[in-house]
Amino acid sequence: VATRKFFQTGKTNMAAKKNTRSKSAKREPQATVGIIGGSGLYSMGGLTDAREIKVKTPFGDPSDAIVLGTLEGKRVAFLARHGRGHRILPSEINYRANVYAMKLLGVERIISVSAVGSLKEDLKPGEFLVADQFFDRTKDRKSTFFGDGLVAHVAFAHPTCGQLSSVLADACVHEAIMVHRRGTYICIEGPQFSTLAEAEVNRQLRFEVIGMTNVTEAKLAREAEICYATIAMITDYDCWHPEHESVTTSQIIATLTQNAENSQKVLRTAVRELPSERTCKCGSALQHSLVTDLKIVPKKTKKRLAAIIGKYIS
């Protein structure tokens, strides 16, 4: 019976489609702000009415169950990037599922909280940086939703949302946490830390911080028309600083504890101060980016990307 209904044509089928679109349009978002916590931030304090949900996506399962709740009067979705217990390598993270799950929940803004190494003397462990640029040195990650008959090229000159980044930086100031309002985050594949030669080259290129995850998320968030900004929590000087021993996991964890506590304060303040409406261009990133004639896009591809491209399909 289900098979026959699926292949029905004519007015009945058209009415069903119209009804489905109508229901979809009326559906309220379960969250408008997404928080992706990195090393050291595996849960979000201060959430009320918190509950866990498992979100299924066309790209597989996210890193963990997503925690939904209310923070400072706004609906928030929290996801531990590496899974609770820190069990997923940077290269193993299902970035597409993580970002798509946020889109399915109605998230319009993603705040990333990530541990990074410093490549400059004046960027000290314990301080925060709100990155405004990324440099991608990852090797073999799936960093696009597109393909399979649909080509899109989104603008990525400015990879983070200026409005969201400004709110994050101001929140750091409000909480008396030293913050650097701009800088380039170089993203490496990992999981190994840099060699001394690599660190020196990165410094010569005048990058500010180094991490292993954020550029992939930023690319996917842009394709999903979600604002994205990073709180980069500095834990160490990588391996280049002559007066500091080479970076070790224990050194990072010690600083992470302090940074995680500070990040919770910043997140609460930032979420409270976020304007209800977006005035940036992130929400229309695909408007002039879809290259393929949508009439010839395979139905399977349209279905898989419905949450992202639905508003552009007539």
Specify the residue positions occupied by each region the protein language model found.
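Metabolite-binding pocket within alpha/beta catalytic cores that recognizes anionic/polar moieties
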Residues: 15-157, 313-314
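Non-catalytic positions within long, well-ordered alpha-helices that form the structural scaffold/packing
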Residues: 103-106, 203, 222
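Generic non-transmembrane alpha-helical segments
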Residues: 163, 167-178, 265-273
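Zn-dependent metallopeptidase/amidohydrolase metal-coordination segment
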Residues: 212-250
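His/Asp/Glu-rich mid-to-C-terminal helical/loop segments that flank catalytic regions of hydrolases
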Residues: 239-286
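A short, charged, Gly/Pro-tolerant segment at domain boundaries
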Residues: 279-314
